Amino acid sequence: MIILKVGGSVITRKDSEEPEIDSENLQRIASEIADASPSSIIIIHGAGSFGHPFARKYGIGSEIKDEEEFRKLRFGSAVTQSWVRKLNTHICDALLDEGIPAVSMPPSAFIRAENGRIRGADLSMIESYLKEGMVPVSYGDVVLDLNPSVRFSVISGDQLINHFSIRLRPERVILGTDVDGVYTRNP
């Protein structure tokens, strides 16, 4: 099994005022994955311009000081989740267009955090989809946080890679970024 991480900066336009897909890159990446035709793969993507601006705007992961701040955070968490789901839908659709049986796996449905770090995750559905020959597609997302003074946290695609790698033991992890080169050691 392979875990492929596609950075949000590769598939979205970070300099855009509004969330915007880099359609050319997304199509190319989906085509390259189809051409490689891996037998078992999990794809994780970053949020890029679909997540980061909203998470910052609403202070997701920050300590909550009062009820008004909590209402703002709760709403902002829902807004951020909505935008990253839209990005995930675009990515799954591009993969489907290439004949890849992609299935969305929103982290908010199977992960809990504590102080912004993954505390628990039920990966059984991901494992089941892999056994059926499907391609789980997960992403950086807003999840519930067990810390009562935080309540919601951002779990990054990088955290997902680490957690999935420890639990699922892939043969290979591939990182796709907008930086040229190949890492031979941890940067």
Which sequence ranges carry the predicted segments?
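Alpha-helix C-terminal capping segments
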Residues: 35-36, 94-98, 163-171
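Active-site glycine-rich loop that binds ribose-phosphate moieties when present
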Residues: 27-30, 118-124, 152-164
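Short beta-strand segments
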Residues: 3-7, 44-45, 105-106, 137-139, ...
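Glycine-rich loop at the start of a catalytic domain that most often binds anionic cofactors/ligands
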Residues: 48-64
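Acidic, metal-binding active-site segment of PIN/NYN-like and related structure-specific nucleases
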Residues: 164-187
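Active-site rim beta-loop-alpha module in soluble metabolic enzymes
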Residues: 131, 137-145, 179-187
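N-terminal glycine-/serine-/threonine-rich phosphate-binding loop
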Residues: 1-42
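Ligand-binding beta-strand-loop-alpha-helix segment within the catalytic cores
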Residues: 59-142
